[in-house]
Amino acid sequence: DPDIVLPGNLGLLSEAYDRCGEVCAEYAKTFYLGTMLMTPDRRRAIWAIYVWCRRTDELVDGPNASHITPQALDRWEARLEDIFNGRPFDMLDAALSDTVSRFPVDIQPFRDMVEGMRMDLWKSRYNNFDELYLYCYYVAGTVGLMSVPIMGIAPESKATTESVYNAALALGIANQLTNILRDVGEDARRGRVYLPQDELAQAGLSDEDIFAGKVTDKWRIFMKKQIQRARKFFDEAEKGVTELSSASRWPVLASLLLYRKILDEIEANDYNNFTRRAYVSKPKKLLTLPIAYARSLVPPKSTSCPLAKT
């Protein structure tokens, strides 16, 4: 019976989860802080998902990225199927394998993320926001969809499951747009421009301006619009947070508010995201936690919004 877990396996599994936590603490400090507010079983599950996403991203962005082939991504996707079928390849896979056996996680967003990495292999420009949105869905909207089954929807929520997933999707998109706006200079040095080409052109800008890395009035006007759009996605996401199970509202709101603050920091840097990397200081991060906690106490709406589909 595969459900009989031997004590030795239990020890290895708990070690596997701890290792996932360490990876998370090392590479995603803000995100890690958010996970510390979760219930232990949820925290471990989110760590396992984070580590898989991180390793997937490393295939395209990591030290060996220049050697990666579409075939390697196919192998990675086959390995994903094995994880979901209870056949993990290594320790970190084992943590995710355990997570997907405990929570009703769907494989599709994971497959979609691999698809995003395939896109990243050949695409380094985005003609318009529709193209960029699709990329953001693949690499980050998927993370929102992966997380909902872990976070759980409040039993008393009257919202449709679809609306909660849409809010989670919006949060993933908002986070990725924020990453893109924070990392413009860094990406340009890798020959990549994750900004809509048509909107750059409308602002009288081109790739050359980005590679030159000079903050001009044109750039400030362009950036204001991009930041405004990212904030809209955060606002959209915030509407769904109240529908999550009570224990999950605080960590998700904290992550949302912390990430949204990066946009404030880009503004504080006078839109210089070429040579400065906007980040939120530790005191600001800690101040955000009680604010998020207070907001997290708001229960799900007792009746669904009058405009919502019933």
Curated annotation (Swiss-Prot):
Transit peptide, start-end: 1-25
Subcellular location: Plastid, Chloroplast
Protein name (database record): Phytoene synthase 2, chloroplastic
Similarity comment: Belongs to the phytoene/squalene synthase family.
SUPFAM superfamilies: Terpenoid synthases (SSF48576)
Reactions that this protein is recorded to catalyse: 2 (2E,6E,10E)-geranylgeranyl diphosphate = 15-cis-phytoene + 2 diphosphate
Enzyme class: transferase
Family matches, as InterPro entries: Isoprenoid_synthase_dom_sf, Squ/phyt_synthse, Squalene/phytoene_synthase_CS, Trans_IPPS_bact-type, Trans_IPPS_HH
A Pfam family that the UniProt record links to this protein: SQS_PSY
